[in-house]
């Protein structure tokens, strides 16, 4: 069965936009088309910002877009000047290839840490969220698809073997000893067996 590709829903919900607009006391009624137009404008803005940031990321030969890439993009593009205050505290870009967190070849890739995540004793994994906190059913399905696809898409790199052979520790085999209880079995109450015999006779007759 082929793995189904996740469809990304990059739409900003107009109903949520309308609620945000109505939190302002000066805004009265809102026409139905207004939140839809704002939603589309947000999509186009993000598309533009991310394309420019992607170009910056690729120019640095990095595999992961970071906040430093976004900061450089915002500083280079005049149309994003209004965002400069937001990225003022973000550290500047370092030299080419010096950023360890940008190069995928340096260091192990993000994978599951042994013992820190995943399901233990039937518990939720680290990506599991409380259904009350999650927004809609489609978001919950998307989250479950994320957890399914994470295992397929990402394969952690195996670190290179050291020059020393791995040490194998063996303990001497222990002889098989059947488990026997050392506690004495309490005797049955003396009056309990006699009524049972009488009840069985009643059922037979």
Curated annotation (Swiss-Prot):
Q: Which residues form the Histone-fold domain?
A: 14-77
Q: Name one GO molecular function term.
A: protein heterodimerization activity
**What's the superkingdom here?**
Eukaryota
**What GO cellular-component annotations does this UniProt entry give?**
negative cofactor 2 complex; nucleus
Where are the annotated segments for Disordered?
A: 91-205
What are the recorded Gene Ontology BP terms? Answer: transcription by RNA polymerase II
Q: Which InterPro entries match?
A: CBFA_NFYB_domain, Histone-fold, Transcr_DNA_Rep_Reg
Compositional bias annotation for Basic and acidic residues: 98-108
Record's subcellular location: Nucleus
Q: Report the SUPFAM superfamilies cross-referenced here.
A: Histone-fold
Compositional bias segments (type: Acidic residues)? 138-155, 196-205
Q: Gene3D superfamilies of this UniProt entry? A: Histone, subunit A
The UniProt PTM text for this protein says:
Phosphorylation reduces DNA binding, but has no effect on heterodimerization and TBP binding.
Task: Quote the subunit structure annotation.
Answer: Heterodimer with DR1. Binds BTAF1.
Q: Which family does it belong to?
A: Belongs to the NC2 alpha/DRAP1 family.
| Role summary | The association of the DR1/DRAP1 heterodimer with TBP results in a functional repression of both activated and basal transcription of class II genes. This interaction precludes the formation of a transcription-competent complex by inhibiting the association of TFIIA and/or TFIIB with TBP. Can bind to DNA on its own.
The entry's protein name is: Dr1-associated corepressor
Q: Which organism is it from?
A: Bos taurus (Bovine)
List the lineage, top down.
Answer: Eukaryota, Metazoa, Chordata, Craniata, Vertebrata
Give the gene that encodes this protein: DRAP1
């Amino acid at each position: 069965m082929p793995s189904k590709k996740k469809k990304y829903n990059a739409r900003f919900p107009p109903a949520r936009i309308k609620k945000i607009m109505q939190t302002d006391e000066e805004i009265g009624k809102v026409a139905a088309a207004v939140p839809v137009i704002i939603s589309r404008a947000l999509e186009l803005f993000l598309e533009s910002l991310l394309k420019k940031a992607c170009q910056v990321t690729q120019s640095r030969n990095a595999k992961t877009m970071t906040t430093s890439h976004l900061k450089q993009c915002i500083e280079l593009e005049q149309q994003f000047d209004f965002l400069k205050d937001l990225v003022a505290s973000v550290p500047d870009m370092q030299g080419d290839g010096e950023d360890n967190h940008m190069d995928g070849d340096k260091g192990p890739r993000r994978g599951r840490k042994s013992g820190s995540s995943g399901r233990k004793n039937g518990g939720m994994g680290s990506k599991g969220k409380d259904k009350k906190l999650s927004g809609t059913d489609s978001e919950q399905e998307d989250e479950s698809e994320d957890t399914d696809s994470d295992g397929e898409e990402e394969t952690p790199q195996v670190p290179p073997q050291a020059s020393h052979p791995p040490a194998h520790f063996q303990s001497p085999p222990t002889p098989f000893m059947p488990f026997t209880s050392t506690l004495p079995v309490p005797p049955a109450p003396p009056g309990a067996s006699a009524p049972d015999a009488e009840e069985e006779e009643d059922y037979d007759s």
